[in-house]
Amino acid sequence: MAQLSKDDILEAVANMSVMDVVDLVKAMEEKFGVSAQAAIAVAGPVAGGEAAAAEEKTEFNVKMVSFGDNKIGVIKAIRTITGLGLKEAKDLVESVPSVVKESVSKEEAEKIKKELEEAGAKVELE
């Protein structure tokens, strides 16, 4: 069996679609029993800063709960917001509830929520 270098792996990941990378991350989480969120928790606030962070959240995840009656309009909005291709955007819309954008500022999250709701989707901020 040939050994793959880190560069070979990085190049392969760079050539994958966003949805394929998401699937890869999920598979790695399952295989190794880890979570991609663990790194975020480690880099989070330290002693005493946690109370302030709980009071004022600065990063939000935009979660689409439903695409409503205008599926095509929502797919177009997803493509504009995320830069995904048609197939990836369609897969994201059809897999609701799904996170559209992660760790965005409150202003950007509100803007994305407004765009998706105008297209007919039901959206939550987490």
Swiss-Prot record:
UniProt record, GO biological process: translation
Record key words, sorted: Ribonucleoprotein, Ribosomal protein
Database matches in InterPro entries: Ribosomal_bL12 (IPR000206), Ribosomal_bL12_C (IPR013823), Ribosomal_bL12_C/ClpS-like (IPR014719), Ribosomal_bL12_oligo (IPR008932), Ribosomal_bL12_oligo_N_sf (IPR036235)
Gene Ontology CC annotations of this record: cytosolic large ribosomal subunit
GO molecular function, one term: structural constituent of ribosome
Pfam families, alphabetized: Ribosomal_L12, Ribosomal_L12_N
CDD domains, A to Z: Ribosomal_L7_L12 (cd00387)
Function, as annotated: Forms part of the ribosomal stalk which helps the ribosome interact with GTP-bound translation factors. Is thus essential for accurate translation.
PANTHER family: 39S RIBOSOMAL PROTEIN L12, LARGE RIBOSOMAL SUBUNIT PROTEIN BL12M
Record's subunit section: Homodimer. Part of the ribosomal stalk of the 50S ribosomal subunit. Forms a multimeric L10(L12)X complex, where L10 forms an elongated spine to which 2 to 4 L12 dimers bind in a sequential fashion. Binds GTP-bound translation factors.
Family the entry assigns: Belongs to the bacterial ribosomal protein bL12 family.
HAMAP family: Ribosomal_bL12
The protein's name in its UniProt record: Large ribosomal subunit protein bL12
Taxonomic lineage from the root: Bacteria, Pseudomonadati, Pseudomonadota, Gammaproteobacteria, Legionellales
Gene symbol of the encoding locus: rplL
